């Protein structure tokens, strides 16, 4: 008689790392800098990387206030979404930003020279033939997307907690002309821009979908807030994918 094998069920917590192929990558900017990052890809039954259904190209919060490629929402996206939603997740440090992965060359430029960083990230996705790239920005990262990310090669963009401090009406008009989907997640209790004002500001982008998130704050602290963000991302990038995402994983885990 062949013994039955059972897989261990793991509750997905803040430190849970689900299986994926993770590799260090370098991005090269048109002004001569090397930026450091990581690409997480879904894996097949044999553990080898496979082509994802879509790609998230992420842009982190303000580096002068602690933002970097490991900011918690993006770290959890990279730890979970390749396995749960068949998504590739590209994270990187913008110029002058450090993380355990390393330090990107250059200096913080307030969102101006970072235009080259945005272009380098989009180009890496193209070079690696990563399918259906969506830009995902958080706080300062939303400013980079609005100012520099309106590229015809992308599928759309998702903005988390956009402050709209640096992005102008002209930037929004550029997105309106591009016509690509623009999904805007705005915390009810945001420190900078709340849902009602966000709807007014983004009204000049006809395709923008502004979603107010009850009880949430700018930093999306807490597992319930993170789950809401990841569900919204997957729901827009892969509309046919079952939601909510699972809270348990059957099988092995990767080391943290």
Task: Identify the function of each model-found stretch.
Residues 136-145:
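Gly/Ala-rich beta-loop-alpha elbow adjacent to hydrolase catalytic centers
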Residues 26-28, 33-128:
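Serine-hydrolase catalytic machinery in alpha/beta-hydrolase-like enzymes
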């Amino acid at each position: 008689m062949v013994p039955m094998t059972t897989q261990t069920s793991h509750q997905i917590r803040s430190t849970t790392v689900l299986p994926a192929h993770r590799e260090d990558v370098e991005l090269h900017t048109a002004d001569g800098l090397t930026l450091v990052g990581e690409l997480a890809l879904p894996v097949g039954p044999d553990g080898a990387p496979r082509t994802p259904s879509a790609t998230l190209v992420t842009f982190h919060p303000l580096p002068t206030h602690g933002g970097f490629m490991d900011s918690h929402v993006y770290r959890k996206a990279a730890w979970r979404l390749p396995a749960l939603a068949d998504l590739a997740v590209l994270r990187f440090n913008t110029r002058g930003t450090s993380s355990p992965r390393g330090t990107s060359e250059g200096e913080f430029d307030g969102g101006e020279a970072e235009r080259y960083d945005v272009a380098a990230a989009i180009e890496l996705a193209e070079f690696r033939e990563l399918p259906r790239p969506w830009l995902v920005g958080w706080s300062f990262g939303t400013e980079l997307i609005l100012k520099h990310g309106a590229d015809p090669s992308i599928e759309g963009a998702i903005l988390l907690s956009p402050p709209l401090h640096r992005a102008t009406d002209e930037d929004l008009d550029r997105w309106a002309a591009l016509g690509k989907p623009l999904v805007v997640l705005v915390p009810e209790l945001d420190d900078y821009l709340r849902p009602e004002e966000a709807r007014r500001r983004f009204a000049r982008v006809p395709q923008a979908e502004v979603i107010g998130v009850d009880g949430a704050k700018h930093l999306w602290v807490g597992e319930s807030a993170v789950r809401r963000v990841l569900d919204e991302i997957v729901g827009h990038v892969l509309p046919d994918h079952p939601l909510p995402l699972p809270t348990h994983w059957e099988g092995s885990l990767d080391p943290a």
